[in-house]
A protein has these predicted regions:
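Soluble non-cytosolic domains of exported or imported proteins
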Residues: 15-23
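Hydrophobic/aromatic-rich core segments of domains that either
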Residues: 22-90
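Short, surface-exposed coil-to-beta transition loops
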Residues: 11, 47-49, 153-154
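Secondary-structure boundary elements
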Residues: 1-13
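Short loop/turn motifs that cap or connect beta-strands within the blades
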Residues: 169-170
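His-Asp-centered catalytic microenvironments across diverse enzyme cores
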Residues: 59-156, 164-166
Length: 171
């Protein structure tokens, strides 16, 4: 009998903390759909990896929650409060810098094919969101996150949504 400690289902990955990219991607699709977001997925040729795409303000972006999980290897354990954003709302070209596959297929939540050239907005490539490894919270006017490690001389940062100016507070 062959056994793998890894889960490929959305609920299995969440409950067992052993999800692979398929688990992350399908869980994200279900959550995003419940939130009313238009969502889909990207898949490498041969199915070696799968990640999400999401439509924001009429434009498609890549989100790879598997590669942004700092504990994606279940044998390494988890680091509470640490989460990456390197692959959050990035363009197809930005994704290709790290996801080096010859052919990528994109599909929306109804499995309709999407052309990679339709995932070309660079609006969020290289923005402050992708530089920090803490949860990012928001209210009506501001974003909040920790620069550095929370409780380890990290600073709480408040960023205005309108001006993107930052204000720093000692934690």
């Amino acid at each position: 009998t062959w056994f793998t400690p890894f889960s490929h289902t959305p609920i299995g990955g969440i409950l067992s903390n052993t999800g692979v990219c398929e688990s992350y991607t399908t869980a994200y699709i279900e959550i995003a759909k419940k939130l009313g977001l238009e969502v889909g997925y990207g898949e490498s040729a041969g199915g070696a990896h799968i990640w999400n795409i999401v439509k924001v303000d009429g434009k498609w972006y890549n989100i790879d929650v598997t590669w942004d999980d700092t504990s994606a290897n279940p044998y390494d354990g988890d680091t509470p409060g640490v989460v990456g954003h390197d692959y959050f709302l990035i363009s197809h070209d930005e994704l290709r810098e790290s996801h080096d596959w010859s052919d990528i297929n994109y599909r929306d939540q109804n499995f309709k094919k999407i052309n990679p050239s339709d995932i070309n907005s660079e609006k969020y490539d290289g923005t402050w969101v992708q530089r920090y490894d803490s949860p990012i919270l928001m209210d009506k006017d501001n974003y909040y996150y920790f620069e550095g490690r929370q409780g380890n001389d990290g600073k709480l940062v408040k960023v205005s949504k309108d001006t993107e100016t930052a204000e720093y507070f000692d934690s």
